[in-house]
Amino acid sequence: MEQSHKTATSQRPEAMKELTRAINDHLAAEFQASHTYLAMSIWLREKDLAGFSTYMLDKSNEERTHASRMIAYLVDSDEQVELPTVEAPERQWPSVQGLFDAVYELEKGVTASINRLYGIAEQQGERSATAMLDWFVAEQLQEEAEARFVCKRLRLAGDNSAALLLLDQQFLEGTALSHVKGGLSGTGSANQA
């Protein structure tokens, strides 16, 4: 029994190193999303779409909060945090529809990265990591549901500027996503999480 305890203890640091590397790599995705969403917020504000702009600014802040959660996990696990370099994001989009199509693709990429982290944590038997990542799995379900919903609404609006302005107003009032369900709780928006 003593021998198996020593083996498990000696393997844990190497297993945790792999997970730590993967989490640090994922931090780049969270910070890049935050930076990209800030650029999107600015672009939308320049187009006088205050509702969409405010929504994307909130999304930018939310992504930094996600990164902070992972940083807290690493610090609490006595692991090294490596802050990533963030590239300058795009600053132009062909349309509001094109912008939200990019949001949806970005969220799908973040989801894939979280799923990769979860797989590593499960493989390494890191229960505290899977517990932390459970929240992210539910959050990403919500994030993708919201992005998909907005893309569908914008497709319905098409070239109708009145419909676009109505949707922008709904974002400004905070009612645009009130019926989007997602996450494990099945309740409204991610801001309630």
What do these predicted regions represent?
Residues 1-193:
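Iron-associated oxidoreductase/ferritin-like identity signal
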